[in-house]
């Protein structure tokens, strides 16, 4: 009860949803993000949050993704894909943290 539910139809939770409006109305400036899949929906949402000026933290051990082939067709493990997504944008769009840091506050 009292929670805002924001259904989404694209990979970013900000596209064609009222999420940004809700956050701004509530004066929320810092986001802590977790979810599936790191290299798709999570990354798209966090990129957009950064572009919109939110102070964004991605909880690395509260996200996961799936194995997939790279551009050359070599299969990359889910851990490799996850790690590359984290490394690509850490410090640019988000700050990577873990659940222990979240719980410490």
Write out the residue ranges for each language-model feature.
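Active-site-adjacent betaalpha module
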Residues: 1-105
């Amino acid at each position: 009860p009292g929670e805002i539910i924001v259904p989404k139809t694209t990979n970013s939770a900000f596209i064609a949803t009222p999420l940004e409006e809700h956050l701004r109305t509530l004066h929320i400036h810092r986001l802590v993000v977790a979810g599936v899949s790191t290299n798709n929906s999570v990354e798209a949402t966090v990129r957009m949050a950064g572009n919109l000026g939110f102070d964004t933290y991605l909880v690395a051990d509260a996200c996961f993704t799936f194995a997939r082939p790279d551009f050359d067709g070599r299969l990359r493990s889910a851990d490799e894909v996850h790690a590359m997504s984290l490394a690509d944008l850490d410090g640019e769009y988000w700050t990577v943290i873990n659940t222990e840091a979240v719980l410490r506050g």
